[in-house]
């Protein structure tokens, strides 16, 4: 049949589909027979309902299903024949006029857009560099030591000493306090606690509480005013000033493990002691630097691609991406243990901007991969899997885990494709190298 495709706009199209009702006769008979085998009706044994009654009860529904199935089949057949680059699924609408001989549908759909790739040579991106030295390793080890911190009462002799002669609370100390707050001499909800534990200097307490606690010894108390802002979430105290009194119940100083072979062993370094531990810490920091640098560069390149390339975005693809993001949000809520998260009413509109950007970038990347032959090779995929596997205790098992699942392999392939696009982009654009410290790198977004 001659294909009629009408241009309804930038990407919107309409295809008119026609087929003879007679083409569905055999399928209709078979479908009704299948329905009849399981049909139940009073006065008849199951599966023994006369054909005319099956036809009367289910004929219209069967016609509806078969016509839509046939229209969909014909649409995809003709779209492939005409070389139509589809963006999403069609919306099929039967013509309102009834024709005894034929069935006519209108298929409304979108086509993939033309992607106009911009001039990458005019773009500039920043590539950060960071050197890991002894100071960075020492800071990382300090963080690991703090994970094994334990506390001893100030002034009491123990296996690690007494914490010094000063028994007053200091920054870094773990304190246990009771406190009570009053407004106009009356206690208020949420303004009282007993055995409240925190570490001074970590910012868990309000600054006024920390300032009042510093310098106090066990058994000592102190009162201080605290003004609640006008927009405070607790309406009963918003805009008011409370008088708090704290009493210190215990003051404990922090003892950190010594960086020695025993400490290395506690981190799983069974051979090589401190030397091997420092080497492994450096290796982990180097890996983190590479990951962070790559993430920052990728984010900037993607933003540049988004601004340099021109295309119309198919609404159908954006809608599908919004639904994926909604489902992802529900899954996240479920993992957090939120009640009834599976059916949470999350409006797709809140993801409109994010979904549009994702679809744009997906189409741009596809165009670049196709035009510049940036496909992911088997060697590249293997190299990426091998590198990811090195961070695990049993790399060989992790490698097998990747190759056992086509979905996981596809994720790796997409990651390699993105890397290929970034390499191509940076080969065309101006890249400014910028050296930063590890701490500075960690704070960059």
UniProtKB/Swiss-Prot annotation:
Record domain PPIase FKBP-type: where: 172-257
Predominant place of localization: cytoplasm
Subcellular location, in the record's words? Cytoplasm
InterPro entries for the chain: PPIase_dom_sf, PPIase_FKBP_dom, Trig_fac, Trigger_fac_C, Trigger_fac_C_sf, Trigger_fac_ribosome-bd_bac, Trigger_fac_ribosome-bd_sf, Trigger_fact/SurA_dom_sf
Q: PROSITE patterns, alphabetically?
A: FKBP_PPIASE (PS50059)
Q: What is its EC number?
A: 5.2.1.8
Q: Which domain of life is it from?
A: Bacteria
TM ranges are none
Q: Which GO terms describe its biological process?
A: cell division; protein folding; protein transport
Which family does the entry's similarity section mention? Belongs to the FKBP-type PPIase family. Tig subfamily.
What NCBIfam families has UniProt attached to this entry? tig
Protein task:
Involved in protein export. Acts as a chaperone by maintaining the newly synthesized protein in an open conformation. Functions as a peptidyl-prolyl cis-trans isomerase.
| Protein name, UniProt field | Trigger factor
- From which organism does this entry originate? Polynucleobacter necessarius subsp. necessarius (strain STIR1)
